[in-house]
């Protein structure tokens, strides 16, 4: 059951390490309209370290070994955009409407799996 969304990862070293660490499952933490969860063993190469994120961004916070998914305002937001508590490395983006995650605000766990890229036929 639950909500299923797809995300596309960027071609960065941090994103590749996250992909290799999958599948990952664990307790889901909520901070405003941000979900975050531990994904241990990933080195943060900080290619895109920033506090500027958009709704739908998937980011890694190396200091906490945490993957974050932004789907709305956070407690630090001044406007409509989410604001992370610290600099994060944007590693990907939700495909479709990230606001769908609002339906999972009471979820206790999250599972992130790999979807293998489509292989060309022929």
Regions found by a protein language model. Give the residues of each.
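Glycine-rich active-site loops that engage anionic ligands at enzyme catalytic sites
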Residues: 7, 11-122
């Amino acid at each position: 059951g639950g909500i299923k969304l797809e995300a596309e990862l960027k071609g960065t070293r941090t994103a590749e390490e996250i992909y290799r660490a999958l599948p990952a499952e664990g307790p889901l933490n909520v901070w405003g309209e941000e979900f975050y969860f531990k994904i241990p063993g990933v080195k943060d190469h900080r290619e895109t370290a920033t506090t500027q994120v958009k709704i739908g961004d998937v980011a890694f916070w190396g200091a906490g070994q945490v993957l974050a998914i932004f789907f709305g305002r956070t407690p630090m937001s001044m406007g409509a955009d989410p604001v992370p508590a610290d600099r994060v490395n944007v590693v990907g983006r939700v495909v479709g409407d990230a606001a769908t995650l609002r339906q999972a605000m009471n979820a206790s766990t999250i599972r992130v799996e790999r979807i293998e890229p489509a292989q060309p036929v022929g």
